[in-house]
């Protein structure tokens, strides 16, 4: 009697079909095929180790290997899940073929007894517990005797439509218009819009929108770091993380922005960078309608509506809505100035301040007055200038009613009423209301006389004294 071979129970995939499966489905396929092979070996069938088995054990892609010659068929559909069907008679014959002479007395004669009736045949799959404890033929598609068993029961029922693959992207997201080849990919994509995270880690409670991400996350708790960097010895839970890490040592930046030419060592960083060039804002606030390019920006913005200020300064007790504002504030206490001008060496505690400072060296004045065309290197200076045209003096003294265009001028004016003199000379102890007055006073204590007359060479400590002196040369006319 002819024995059932591994070729008879093996299932092939084309590259297109293999891509239809997600990671969990590919792993399931590997488990089932290896279990088929082990079952044949355990029954005493003498077979060589097929290339497919070797490939599966090494976790290589199986679609490049040929188990046996197959008839040509049109590409593009994951058809194995609807074509690889066994009739009841075929199952019984196949299990008889698996039992060569001499093996009946080893306990295999009970295999047939598992089928109680033609309408309710149970085929025990031994190691297939991860798919189903048994395959009930009453739930399967009718062929010939109206009852058949599909090899991949799990795929055939719950995922048949989800893994259908066509050359076109037929599954479209109604929210953003993005299209997908596979329905399951669309289902997963929709979770971005809904915020659904159905897969929860039992260890820490963190939730994910993909089961594969949860599986990878679990390695953090298991402390499994299979992938080690040969350069520095650092370990990683994922091979992709090791690949990205290696670029730190090599300096490789393979992902280049087509708009500006900037290069990145990770594709995800490039994708985030591209949003700078794009006007599209994916994340919208439900409270006020304001949109953002990054989800992190939206999350920080939401704190404004909630009144939440989770970042508190231990030095002064000041609280902040965002971590970036808190980090900037800390530099006031530490005196840290990490942003240095390459032209003059002056340092600043904020990158934005350095950017505006550089305009002194470049002469750039990007802010232009629409009324008179005058240009300024700071937006704040332009705003103050506009008040000349509007006649507005928004800053009013509550004591005397005098109004000012600039808040700093109001602040200095208030000192007249309070008598406050916060600026004190360290040399003589004299106090002044304004810092500019103190700077002028300091010149008394120095021998420096920066203001020199071109006519006679006489020098003065204060600029106001120079114009008065010049009148002596002009006969009192200036």
From Swiss-Prot:
This is Zinc finger protein 718. GO terms for biological process: regulation of DNA-templated transcription. PROSITE patterns: KRAB, ZINC_FINGER_C2H2_1, ZINC_FINGER_C2H2_2. It comes from Homo sapiens (Human). The gene is ZNF718. CDD domains: KRAB_A-box. It comes from the Eukaryota. Residues 4-75 form the KRAB domain. Pfam families: KRAB, zf-C2H2. Keywords: DNA-binding, Metal-binding, Nucleus, Repeat, Transcription, Transcription regulation, Zinc, Zinc-finger. It is found in: Nucleus. May be involved in transcriptional regulation. GO terms for cellular component: nucleus. A zinc finger (C2H2-type) spans 171-193, 199-221, 227-249, 255-277, 283-305, 311-333, 339-361, 367-389, 395-417, 423-445, 451-473. GO terms for molecular function: DNA-binding transcription factor activity, RNA polymerase II-specific; RNA polymerase II cis-regulatory region sequence-specific DNA binding; zinc ion binding. InterPro entries: KRAB (IPR001909), KRAB_dom_sf (IPR036051), Znf_C2H2_sf (IPR036236), Znf_C2H2_type (IPR013087).
């Amino acid at each position: 009697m002819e024995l059932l071979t591994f070729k008879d129970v093996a299932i092939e995939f084309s590259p297109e079909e293999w891509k239809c499966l997600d990671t969990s489905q590919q792993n399931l396929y590997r488990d089932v095929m290896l279990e088929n092979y082990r079952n044949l070996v355990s029954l005493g069938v003498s077979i060589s180790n097929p290339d497919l088995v070797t490939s599966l054990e090494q976790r290589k892609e199986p679609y490049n290997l040929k188990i046996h010659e197959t008839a040509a068929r049109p590409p593009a559909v994951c058809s194995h899940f609807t074509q690889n069907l066994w009739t009841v008679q075929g199952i019984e014959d196949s299990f008889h073929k698996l039992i060569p002479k001499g093996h009946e007395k080893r306990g295999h004669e009970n295999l047939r007894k598992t089928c109680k009736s033609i309408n309710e045949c149970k085929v025990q799959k031994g190691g297939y517990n991860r798919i189903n404890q048994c395959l009930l033929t009453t739930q399967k598609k009718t062929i010939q005797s109206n009852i058949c068993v599909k090899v991949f029961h799990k795929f055939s029922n719950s995922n048949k439509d989800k893994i259908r693959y066509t050359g076109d992207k037929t599954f479209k997201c109604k929210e953003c218009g993005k299209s997908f080849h596979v329905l399951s990919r669309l289902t997963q994509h929709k979770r971005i819009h809904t915020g659904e995270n159905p897969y929860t880690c039992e260890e820490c409670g963190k939730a994910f929108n993909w089961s594969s991400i949860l599986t990878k996350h679990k390695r953090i708790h298991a402390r499994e770091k299979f992938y080690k960097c040969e350069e520095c010895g650092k370990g990683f839970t994922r091979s992709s993380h090791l690949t990205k890490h290696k670029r730190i040592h090599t300096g490789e930046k393979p992902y280049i922005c087509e708009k500006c030419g900037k290069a990145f060592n990770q594709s995800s960083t490039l994708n985030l960078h591209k949003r700078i060039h794009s006007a599209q804002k994916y994340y919208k606030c439900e409270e006020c309608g304001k949109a953002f390019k990054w989800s992190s920006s939206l999350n920080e913005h939401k704190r404004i509506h909630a009144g939440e200020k989770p970042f508190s300064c231990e030095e002064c007790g000041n609280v902040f809505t965002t971590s970036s504002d808190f980090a900037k504030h800390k530099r006031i206490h530490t005196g840290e100035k990490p942003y240095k001008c390459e032209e003059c060496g002056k340092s600043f505690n904020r990158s934005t301040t350095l950017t505006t400072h550089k305009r002194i060296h470049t002469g750039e004045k990007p802010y232009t007055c629409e009324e008179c065309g005058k240009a300024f290197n700071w937006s704040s200076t332009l705003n103050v200038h506009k008040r000349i045209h509007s006649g507005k003096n928004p800053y009013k003294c509550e004591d005397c009613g005098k109004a000012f265009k600039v808040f700093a001028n109001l602040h200095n004016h208030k000192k007249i009423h309070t008598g406050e003199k916060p600026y004190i000379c360290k040399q003589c102890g004299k106090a002044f209301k304004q810092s500019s007055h103190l700077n002028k006073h300091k010149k008394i204590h120095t021998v420096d006389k920066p203001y020199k007359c071109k006519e006679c060479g006489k020098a003065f400590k204060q600029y106001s004294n120079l114009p008065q002196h010049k009148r002596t040369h002009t006969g009192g006319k200036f």
